[in-house]
């Protein structure tokens, strides 16, 4: 049985959930991404996860009010959600956190009061070894604490609910190199290239296979899926949803990625945010998917166990 652990940064440890079981009902709704048929688009990502009566907000978009505005337009009430997952520390995934916490807590003091991140989220960043470290994340941590929020930093996979896993830091077995910057990060071992070591993904274990939800997948989609299959369950990939940072990938890299996804039994793919547009179409072709099972994700697009991909006119 996989060990379950979470390191509380502000207070306490994550509670050990009941024994693992398959998630039976899942709906994932995109609340922030580049394309929008309804609501507002932005360079960022956020999604609402609803699974067996539980709700989790995954990432919070770039601008303070985008996710809240889009949710209101879609008549989605986020105030009942206490758990938020931040896939990594970039501001296009964390930018909405404070405003969401402040606004939603007016209706429910527990709204978005527990933020899950992976180890490395709070590492100091700098553009070069001689420059002063950025304080953006330190400020975010302090401001979130002032709202009554708690950060929970995980150094390994943790079950948030039965069958719903946050992977923690993901080993970089394949050289996918899915990051853009040339900055540096201060780690316990010293100054290193900032390859976004805290990048993490959410995994839902269903009886049809695993659903993988990523913000940017800086660890690499194949590294992420292989780690999920190792630590959660060696099962087919029922769906991969989110940003996968393939926008600059070569055709050879995309073909390799698509072949691996095909080997993993990928059934559904929604590539949003930094995935790019052409990469989605190439994966559709090379992985043997269709217009119904592989789309460029837009604001308001959904995936459910019952109906599969529910796309708007823009992304269908």
Predicted stretch roles:
Residues 57-61, 82-89, 116-118, 212-216, ...:
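Active-site neighborhood of phospho(di)ester-bond hydrolases with catalytic His/Asp-centered motifs
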Residues 148-153, 260-316:
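Binuclear metal-ion centers of metallo-dependent hydrolases, dominated by the metallo-beta-lactamase
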Residues 38-40, 54-83, 106, 178, ...:
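Pre-active-site segment of Zn-dependent metallo-hydrolases
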Residues 27-74, 195, 199-214:
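Conserved beta-strand hairpin/beta-sheet module of binuclear metal-dependent hydrolase folds
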Residues 120-200, 295-306, 312:
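Metallo-beta-lactamase
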Residues 178-181, 187-236, 242-245:
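Active-site-proximal loop/helix segments of hydrolase catalytic cores
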Residues 1-8:
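Bacterial N-terminal signal peptides
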Residues 65-117, 230-241:
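Active-site metal-binding motif and surrounding structural segment of the metallo-beta-lactamase
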């Amino acid at each position: 049985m996989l060990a379950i652990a979470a390191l509380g940064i502000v207070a306490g440890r994550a509670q050990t959930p009941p024994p693992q079981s398959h998630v039976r009902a899942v709906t994932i709704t995109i609340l922030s991404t580049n394309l929008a048929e309804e609501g507002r688009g932005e360079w960022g990502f956020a999604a609402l996860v609803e699974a067996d009566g539980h709700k989790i907000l995954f990432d919070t978009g770039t601008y303070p009010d985008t996710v809240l505005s889009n949710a209101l337009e879609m008549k989605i009430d986020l105030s009942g959600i206490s758990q938020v997952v931040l896939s990594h520390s970039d501001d296009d995934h964390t930018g909405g956190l404070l405003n969401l916490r402040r606004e939603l807590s007016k209706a429910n003091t527990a709204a978005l009061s527990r933020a899950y991140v992976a180890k490395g989220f709070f590492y100091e960043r700098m553009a070069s070894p001689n420059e002063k470290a950025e304080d953006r994340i330190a400020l975010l941590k302090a401001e979130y604490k002032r709202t009554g929020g708690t950060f929970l930093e995980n150094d390994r996979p943790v079950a948030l609910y039965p069958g719903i896993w946050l992977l923690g830091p993901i080993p970089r077995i394949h050289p996918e190199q899915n990051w853009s910057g040339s900055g540096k990060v201060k780690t316990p071992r010293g100054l290193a290239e900032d390859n976004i070591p805290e990048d993490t993904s959410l995994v839902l274990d269903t009886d049809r296979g695993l659903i993988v939800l990523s913000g940017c997948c800086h660890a690499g989609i194949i590294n992420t899926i292989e780690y999920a299959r190792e630590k959660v369950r060696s099962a087919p990939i029922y769906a991969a949803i989110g940003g996968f940072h393939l926008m600059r990938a070569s055709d050879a890299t995309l073909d390799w990625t698509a072949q691996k996804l095909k080997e993993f039994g990928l059934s559904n793919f929604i590539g949003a945010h930094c995935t790019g547009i052409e990469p989605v179409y190439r994966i559709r072709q090379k992985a043997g998917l269709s217009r119904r099972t592989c789309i460029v994700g837009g604001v308001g697009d959904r995936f459910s166990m019952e109906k599969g991909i529910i796309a708007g006119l823009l992304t269908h």
